[in-house]
Amino acid sequence: MTNLSKVTVGYDTFTFELDDLKTAVIGGYNASTGENSGMELVNDCYAEHQVNPDIIIAPGFSSDPEVAAVMAAKAGCINTVFKGRAIIDADCETTKVYSGVPKWKNDNSITGERQILCWPMMKIGERVFHLSSRLAAIMAATDVDNGDCPSKSPDNKELGATSLCLKDGTNVVMNLEKANYLNANGVMTGLNFVGSFKAWGSHTACFPGSSDPVECLIPVARMFDWVGNSLILTYWSRIGDKLDRRLCESIADSSSQWMNSLTAAGHLYGGRVEFDEGENSEKDIMAGILKPHVYMAPVSPLVEVNWIQEYDSSYVTGALGS
């Protein structure tokens, strides 16, 4: 083996136009070559790696409303059957004050149930990072620690930041009042309130326009995605089997047992799978189309605690022994 005492690396400087980069990130399908690019590459992940990407990020580009819209659309239709979420960064260059984020959000139509919006950026030392990249990592790590199940919220999890900041590195001081204002407008942020910097918020970007927990609460929404994706993969091997009563009962029984196991593990309040004859017409059955109905209630995250205090004079009587 040759010992190297010095290695010299040379490189060229490449200059790209922002619009060119944006176009590359959005990508598309090339009918001439049959190749995907940009966001369309999400559809190639499972085919090539047997991994379903359920979190989509584009740090540095997602604050563009066109990119954010494409991310949300792709998250809602991965390989035509799977579903996921897109984490979007609000603009930290023009939106410099927390109170202006809701207006930016609405003006740029970042209000979809499949979008998770965050503001501002964060620092580790002097390095500046987009919050979406950190939130994606937090969500993935939380899922792994939770048995590879997304029933826990990224809310109040370690952010690993030393400060919050704007794009130019200007520090942003985020107190509880400001953080809760952002949360109330469907924006996740960071907060250094008790202990260290934590991710703060459990709502998707559709909040407060929608208060449906399936749409607006991150872990509840992700559980619906995950259960749906898991059922598709689990019963994919049954495609081609005879569509008879035995098959229907087998799918309903085994999937309901799985839902029971999720309930026992604390991921669901409860769940079951049934076949409704009204939803499975004779025409569909003859065409080989089956529609199992999944009923489920994922466990909600704790969002707010309101302590109620009352003076109870009976303790005085008991203490004085009268």
Residue ranges and their predicted role:
Residues 3, 51-52, 267-269:
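Short loop/turn motifs at secondary-structure junctions
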Residues 16, 24-30, 268-322:
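Compositionally biased, low-complexity/repeat regions
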Residues 2, 92, 122-123, 278-288:
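Short, ordered beta-strand-loop transition motifs
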Residues 21-24, 29-235, 272, 276:
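A glycine- and small-residue-enriched flexible loop/hinge signal that marks low-structured segments
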Residues 10, 59, 295-297:
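Structured loops at beta-to-helix junctions and adjacent beta-edge loops in soluble globular domains
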Residues 217-278:
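Acidic, low-complexity glycine/serine/threonine-rich segments
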